[in-house]
């Protein structure tokens, strides 16, 4: 069974969002998503400074099974990426909620967070 931390918000496209409390969020993919993908071998990170639009592709994760687009869960600007994934994409499998975040985004509108699912809502989508 997939781990679904209560302190995060979720998109139904399997991204998690951590509200950093300063107008920024940290984004990654869920345990359920990495489990479906299998062993991750490559992560295409967005470029810092890129404007992202909620529900549009902003990253890519490749595994031994498939390549999967990663969708921005909020509108904003990429302010930081997790360069550790360039050398260790397997972190996505090993620690999807800890060391394997993909990007930090400066929110265009904090109300975007209200459109995301809580842990119970996300759990219902993958049940």
UniProtKB/Swiss-Prot annotation:
The keyword Cell membrane does not apply. The keyword RNA-binding does not apply. Binds 1 lipoyl cofactor covalently. Its cofactor is (R)-lipoate. Signal peptide: none annotated. Residues 24-106 form the Lipoyl-binding domain. GO terms for biological process: glycine decarboxylation via glycine cleavage system. The modification N6-lipoyllysine is found at residue 65. PROSITE patterns: BIOTINYL_LIPOYL, LIPOYL. Keywords: Lipoyl. GO terms for cellular component: cytosol; glycine cleavage complex. The glycine cleavage system catalyzes the degradation of glycine. The H protein shuttles the methylamine group of glycine from the P protein to the T protein. The glycine cleavage system is composed of four proteins: P, T, L and H. NCBIfam families: gcvH (TIGR00527), PRK01202.1 (NF002270). PANTHER family: GLYCINE CLEAVAGE SYSTEM H PROTEIN, GLYCINE CLEAVAGE SYSTEM H PROTEIN-RELATED. Belongs to the GcvH family. This is Glycine cleavage system H protein. It comes from Marinomonas sp. (strain MWYL1).
């Amino acid at each position: 069974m997939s781990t679904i931390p209560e302190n995060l918000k979720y998109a139904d496209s399997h991204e998690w969002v951590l509200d950093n409390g300063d107008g920024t969020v940290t984004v990654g993919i869920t345990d359920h998503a990495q489990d479906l993908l299998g062993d991750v071998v490559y992560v295409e990170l967005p470029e810092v400074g890129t404007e992202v639009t909620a529900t549009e592709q902003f990253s890519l994760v490749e595994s031994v099974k498939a390549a999967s687009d990663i969708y921005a869960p909020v509108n904003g600007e990429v302010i930081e990426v997790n360069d550790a994934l360039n050398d260790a994409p397997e972190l996505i499998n090993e620690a999807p909620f800890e060391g394997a975040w993909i990007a930090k985004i400066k929110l265009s509108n904090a109300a975007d967070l209200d459109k995301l699912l809580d842990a119970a809502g996300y759990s219902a989508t993958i049940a």
